[in-house]
Amino acid sequence: MVAIPNIKIKFGPQGSVRTFQTLSDSSKKIEHVVTEDLSQSSEKSKKRGGPKELDEVQPKKKQRLDCDWSSQCLALLRFLMEHRGGWLFKEPVDPVKMEIPDYFNVIQKPMDLGTVKSKLLKNVYSNADEFAADVRLTFANAMHYNPLWNEVHTIAKEINEIFEVRWESLMKKKVLRLSWNEVREGYKRQPVERDCSRRSSTGTSASSGVGLTKPAKENSEKGSLSSKPVKVQSKKNTPAVTPKALATCKCGRIICICLKSCSSFGSDVCSLTDCQLKNISGAQASELDPQSNGSDTSKKERNGSLKSQLDKPSNSDLLGNELKTAFPALPPVPPEKALRAAILKAQYAGTIIKAKHRIVLGQNNKADLIRIQIEKEQMERAQREEKARIEAEMRAAKVAERMRAQDELKQKRESQRLEIAKMKKGFDFERNNHSKLKKKFVKVCGCFSLTKARLLLEELGLVLKNDYCPELEVIGSEKFDAMRMDDLEEGEIL
């Protein structure tokens, strides 16, 4: 055995590179053998293929339909199956049972709603378009096999139209949801650094004095940091500020990062406010920079342009006014539901407070426990007051309803009384009594004989009709019979 001193082998893309001291012939032979082995192993690895080739050979994982879309598709499918003619498409077509032996000759790809439902439950579909294609194929087969005058053809056409309308509405909702998610995610990637402390005149003078003492290097570093999306600032870079300036900040810090959640129709507002904030911060940095080349007039012009930009009505105000006018006011909540909500809020006050703070409090932190207890008591007190107010409103509503019912009953009784009075006035039984009328007639005419009464009335210029005097008709008929008796001959029968 021959020892090989200080051998160094480096592996590269072209093979192995050797660096070692000059050796004897035997050591050179060993070197040649080692290099040949390394070259052979590299060639074999190239023939077998690298990790990229292995990745290409491995099959990609098939995508599946997400839960939200599958639930919406399942609800739409159930709606179609519950249609008055949906039972025709629930099961696959049986040519033997329906006595249609040529069905599979006409229809090459049979499909039904039951099969679509089973595939949907087994999560076979990779996207929603496959589901829609199977549903359309079901109704297309029915319309293709059955003629136009067949009832199955008309029902399939009707259900297919319903499906197309509902599917179009689902696709519109999906597009709106995707656009909203993209806007929200894109805005979350660009957090905006905003100055939360609105300093007073004294605070601004103190902070500007401190900033002027710092070198230009720190100002350049601050400018580079402000241009990038910063999430946390170190304590070394924060300038010293007077207590008055600190008191004006609500969150207790000089600069905080506010991530504004941007809605689907508020993205323009967000971009506009970001540009205004960047312009203001750039103007302040240029004013604080001691090495900036510019006169006082240029600074005044810049400040005037900034003020004019801020004084102009922004798109946020316009959009806010549009939103106020576009959405109508919500209807008032019934007292029963409001009382139920107040009771539930009072019952779960502790849970609501924990959810607002989003932390799990420990037993050792007494300050937080006391603060949470105070907030819980305040919430319970507010809920009790709201509950009492709602109960008082309910009692007042019940009293008002009772009074309204009594008023309606009184009005109904009064209307009935007036109707009875009108009916009694229209026909009074006491005044229209037959005996009283007879007595008055005798008193006026002097007798109750119809003949004398008729003569008296004729003298007064009044004539009674035959309808109102049946006795006169009888007398007239008797006269007519007597006249006919005179005209009769012997032996003639009347």
Swiss-Prot record:
Residues 33-61, 191-237, 286-318 are annotated as: Disordered. It comes from the Eukaryota. It is found in: Nucleus. Residues 199-209 have a biased composition (Low complexity). Residues 50-61 have a biased composition (Basic and acidic residues). The keyword Lipid biosynthesis does not apply. Gene3D superfamilies: Bromodomain-like. Residues 286-296, 305-318 have a biased composition (Polar residues). Residues 64-170 form the Bromo domain. Keywords: Bromodomain, Coiled coil, Nucleus, Transcription, Transcription regulation. One of its GO terms (cellular component) is nucleus. Residues 366-428 form a coiled coil. InterPro entries: Bromodomain, Bromodomain-like_sf, Env_Response_Regulator, GTE_bromo. This is Transcription factor GTE12. It comes from Arabidopsis thaliana. The gene is GTE12.
